[in-house]
Amino acid sequence: MSSSINGLNESEGSTPLSTASIIGSSEQLYMTHDERYLDVLQQYEVETENKRDFDLEEEQWGVLSGSCVDGTYWSAEEKELFFQAVARNGKRDLDLIAYSIPSKSAVQIERYINALENELRWLRNHVDASVRSQCLLKYEDIPIAMEMSQNWIDWEEKIAERLLEGSNISGVETSHYNAQSVKNKTSNEDLFDTNEMRKISERFYHFDRQAPFPSNPLSAGATEFLLQIIKSKLKELIGTSIFLAESRFRKLEANNAFHRKPIIKNRDVVLSGKFLRFHRFNIPGFWKYLPTRQKMNVYKRNKRLKFQNYIHIMESDERQSKLKLGRVRARKTKNNENTMFFDSKEHSTDESDGNLGEHDVKRKVDSVPADETSINGFKKSVNQAEYPDNAQMFMDESVAEESLVEIDDSVEAYDMIQSKNYESFVWKYVLHLTDEMSTEDALFETIPLSNLLAQKRMKDKLKGSDVFTTLKITSKSLHNIDEHSDSDDEVQPICYYYKDPVVSHAPGAAEVVSELESGYVGLISYDLSNLPNSTEDPERKLAKPVSSWELSLPLK
């Protein structure tokens, strides 16, 4: 009995479930038909609108008809395909246009395009603007459209489905992250995985973490070095400016009626900078020691030059450059003086006698010295046969003279030409970066101060003997040994450095001179007087050589 009741209940309960499923399926079917109806209606409206636009266009511009264009017959269908292909691919892509019109070749299509362009050009040049506006379309009237391929449409549909389903790649990859570990982190900075970022950056940029030429860090000694330069140069500038300001009032101070104090003006500071040559650059030193600063090897005819030989060659080129530019400037000054003299003489003659004959003018012109171009041509013709180097030098002088004529006769123009000459001297050689420093380069780069201290003691011992005098006389290096500067007694001495440490005993004069001359490397400016009292180990402390054009710092 109970089983029959349960069966009845199950049969009764099955009826409403089947009814709900039927109702749900009918609603889904209704929604599907409704969406389909809306799609068909929208498509019909679009087609109707396009047909209306096409009918209006035909009413306005007419229907294409067949005609002969440049000896070739074009039917209405071919013209329609032609304009569709031009709108899709452009008028320059003849191959794609010819692919769309199988009955026409690329040459025939090109002739049709040229005929249309010529007609358009004639219409723009010979038809009034009011009439032309009725015959031609404007760019703003042309609808903006872009034609997409079926592959692009399929890809867009696929991306849209992924966005709706929530199955994008980033969601799949990040779904396994532990949310509890993220909550336990203290700050937002902990969310960055620095190790993974480092790996990604190394894979992306493909270069080593360490630079090939790492620069030395700026130490406290370098900062003090720069501050000392600024202080010393500023002191010189202020002192010279005060001297110039006082010189302007020197005569007025002699009279008791005037009791004014000198005032430093702007022109005093500018003139002081020119007196101290702050506005000039050491151009020869810059280009001469460029390979040394950049740690380059110098090669000439596939042979590496030593530093001393390279400096000697550059100094000889420097002397020739100074001589050449000096002659050019002297010649230019003389030409300017001759021109000014001739102009003033001609002006005074015109004022005294307004009517000069052609013969007198010709005689005055002939009396002027010959043009420098003829002199240069004569020098060039004479020296080319006998002295080729001199011919090249005179040719360089003419080029430098033309540069001086084009630019203003100023210090900046002279420095620019001089810098170009020295730069050309440097690039005559082949320069390569040094991969591995040799023993000689290593000694030249860093030098123990203990060697300098031994040398200073040796020099102090020999100062009163004949050995030191012989050493100073027979020294043929770049500079002499100066104990003090001529301008300031506080400037520290510039000392020679030699490869081998100088012995403490005093040998013969000839042995000292030969030993020191053979071991000469460069110049070093350092305060050696305070070195014995210093707490630092002189064996560990190293010094670098300074160039001949670098200045020493005043002691504190």
From Swiss-Prot:
It is found in: Nucleus, Nucleolus. Keywords: Nucleus, Transcription, Transcription regulation. GO terms for biological process: nucleolar large rRNA transcription by RNA polymerase I; transcription initiation at RNA polymerase I promoter. CDD domains: SANT. It comes from the Eukaryota. GO terms for cellular component: nucleolus; nucleus; RNA polymerase I upstream activating factor complex. The keyword Transport does not apply. InterPro entries: Homeodomain-like_sf, Rrn5, SANT/Myb. Pfam families: Myb_DNA-binding (PF00249). One of its GO terms (molecular function) is rDNA binding. Component of the UAF (upstream activation factor) complex which interacts with the upstream element of the RNA polymerase I promoter and forms a stable preinitiation complex. UAF seems to stimulate basal transcription to a fully activated level. Component of the UAF (upstream activation factor) complex which consists of spp27/uaf30, rrn5, rrn10, and histones H3 and H4. Interacts with rrn10. This is RNA polymerase I-specific transcription initiation factor rrn5.
